[in-house]
Swiss-Prot record:
It is found in: Plastid, Chloroplast membrane; Plastid; Nucleus. This is Protein ORANGE, chloroplastic. It comes from the Eukaryota. Its sequence is related to the DnaJ family but lacks the J domain. The CR-type-like region is similar to CR-type zinc-fingers. Belongs to the orange-like family. Keywords: Chloroplast, Membrane, Nucleus, Plastid, Repeat, Transit peptide, Transmembrane, Transmembrane helix. GO terms for biological process: chromoplast organization; positive regulation of carotenoid biosynthetic process; unidimensional cell growth. The gene is OR. It comes from Brassica oleracea var. botrytis (Cauliflower).
Length: 305
């Protein structure tokens, strides 16, 4: 429709002197050549505009607008699918490059202001602990988590095995009635030596704590396996040019001592041009993401690999 509208827009206006004169004007060979040349130029312009519009459509088209709206893939044509895959594949690396530059500028600003915060570099998710008053579970405090869980389990076992039966006998709770109940059912008398309330409480608490501990430790270990092996999840490597200092010491000869064999050199400090004074450079394996795999061939992006 856009091509037809452009062709109609370059047609001559109606001749007020009659249709015969206008037909004779159009029938001349010069007019035909000029119109043919205009039509071909318009076709080329329209094709370029269509390609530009398709690129803009591929760049601005969003399949998933948000968590509430998901569009159907079946309605898309093959060319649309290819254009959207290409545009999104390019956007992945553009966003990674933007994140890398933003982090470098953030580190430079923190260095200029004297702010040193190493926790910002470790942005992997933390898991909240199920035990109250404990910090979120990470690989750093995993030993504290082990010690707390084992001490809690040991306390429950001691309470259920020693303290609770002693308190029941002193307070007169259970004991004889439970023994009579076992004897009336003609069950082994060894069962009367175990309090069912204490046994169920201790066994259930220990089982629940152990199961939750195993699940959360497995989550932390899975996150460790997903980290990049080179940068250990930080996304950065130490700059080899400045030895992670962010500055270079350059010595320049100034003058020679009388005799001509020795020269006096002065040193000056300047910011490292390789890392821009940050002391760290981008990890080429994870592209500053800290994850083990960050490319278009990631199984999370391409499910057919």
């Amino acid at each position: 429709m856009s091509c037809l509208g452009r062709i109609l827009s370059v047609s001559y206006p109606p001749d007020p002197y009659g249709s015969r004169l206008s037909v004779s004007k159009l029938s001349s060979p010069g007019r035909n050549r000029r119109l043919r040349w205009r039509f071909t130029a318009l076709d080329s312009d329209s094709s370029s505009l269509d390609s530009d519009s398709s690129d803009k459509f591929a760049a601005g088209f969003c399949i998933i607008e948000g968590p509430e709206t998901v569009q159907d893939f079946a309605k898309m044509q093959l060319q649309e699918i290819q254009d959207n895959i290409r545009s999104r594949r390019n956007k992945i690396f553009l966003h990674m490059e933007e994140v890398r530059r933003l982090r470098i500028q953030q580190r430079i600003r923190n260095t200029e202001l004297g702010i040193i915060d190493e926790e910002q570099e470790h942005e992997l998710p933390n898991f909240p602990s199920f035990i109250p008053f404990l910090p979120p579970l990470t690989a750093a405090n995993l030993r504290v988590y082990y010690a707390t869980c084992f001490s809690l389990i040991a306390g429950i076992i001691l309470f259920g095995g020693l303290l609770a039966p002693t308190l029941e006998l002193k307070l007169g709770i259970g004991g004889t009635s439970y023994k009579d109940f076992i004897q009336s059912l003609h069950l082994p008398m060894q069962l009367s030596q175990v309090d069912p309330i204490v046994a169920s409480f201790s066994g259930g608490a220990v089982g629940v704590i152990s199961a939750l501990m195993v699940v959360e430790v497995n989550n932390v270990k899975q996150q460790e396996h997903k980290r990049c092996k080179y940068c250990l999840g930080t996304g950065y490597l130490a700059c080899a040019r400045c030895s992670s200092t962010g500055s270079l010491i350059i010595s320049e000869p100034v003058s020679a001592i009388a005799g001509g064999n020795h020269s006096v050199s002065t040193s000056k400090t300047e910011r490292c041009s390789n890392c821009s004074g940050a002391g760290k450079v981008m990890c080429p394996t994870c592209l500053c993401t800290g994850m083990a795999m960050a490319s278009e061939h990631d199984p999370r992006i391409d499910p057919f690999l």
